Amino acid sequence: MSEKVVRLGTRGSALALAQSGMVARMLETAAAAQGMDWRVELVTVRTQGDTSRAALSQLGGIGVFAAQLRTHLLEGQVDLAVHSFKDLPTAPVTGLHIAATPRRADPRDALVASNGMSLAQLPSGASVGTGSPRRVAQLKALRPDIKTVDLRGNVPTRLGRVRGVQIAADAGTSPQALGTGADLDAVVLACAGLERLGLAKHISEAFNPEQMLPAPSQGVLAIETAQELDPQLEAVIAQVNDPASHLAAVAERAVMSTLQAGCAAPVGTYAYLVHAGFDYELHLEAGVFALDGAASVRSRQAATLGGVDLTKACHLQKATELGQRAAQDLLAQGAGQVADLQAVKERG
């Protein structure tokens, strides 16, 4: 049996390589289970988000990490690409589609602080780093007195800016690349990224969705391929798909698309499945937040999914409609006055 080489496009950051390596191993295992000898080769692609030092909110966030990977897919330079789903624009790209979403990691946001302090324990006027307007808005709502500092760089570099946090060189960067020095009291990052890099031990506090709603599809990976796909490759990729994670991501992303908001907008969402007798219920919470933390609107919605087969197209439609309903509720509550969603989008 001859070995088949599959080219997987990925960004070059430590986190992207860790995530893509995880997917590569999943695909090789799935192929082996079907009697095929696969080697998934990582193809590193540099993107604007990796090379620009501008703040993410100024880059707009809308696909800044995805465009070059998608170009490689369309040109046939790679067979598939792995994205953090939250980095993908909600508008579809002709000729491409999301072939699978592996099981979602922890979607929550995490605080990494000096001496393991929680947000409540940080001193008055503490400096907290984040590149996300969504996190800034919700941090300000919880602690109006703190100072937020815009933050760029990979995960180890960000952690290296927290006073008292020591990051080993094997975390994905060299000691010389750990930024400008320890000048912050804390940073806020995604739990999923810290876990995938083996850095979860540095988490001081994980925020529940009542405290801080995550970004839409945070913690979800998207495996993207050409629309016209080799049937064998399609069958193997399908084996790593997690329908529950896919439905949650679809509902959350429908909130963003209905609001016409970009990735940098102060919008949070969290969707999850619960058993309801012989059926499932898909629950969704969504919110829009003022950047100064002074105002917000939230919506809670649910939809019943009949039966146990979560892969049915009708369930995807219900998930989409659930997200649309939540977004319409937010708009009816004045989301457009709470945050200038269109202005945020236009900075992209």
Question: Positions of the model-derived regions?
Answer:
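Structured loop/turn residues at beta-strand edges in well-structured enzyme cores
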Residues: 76, 124, 182
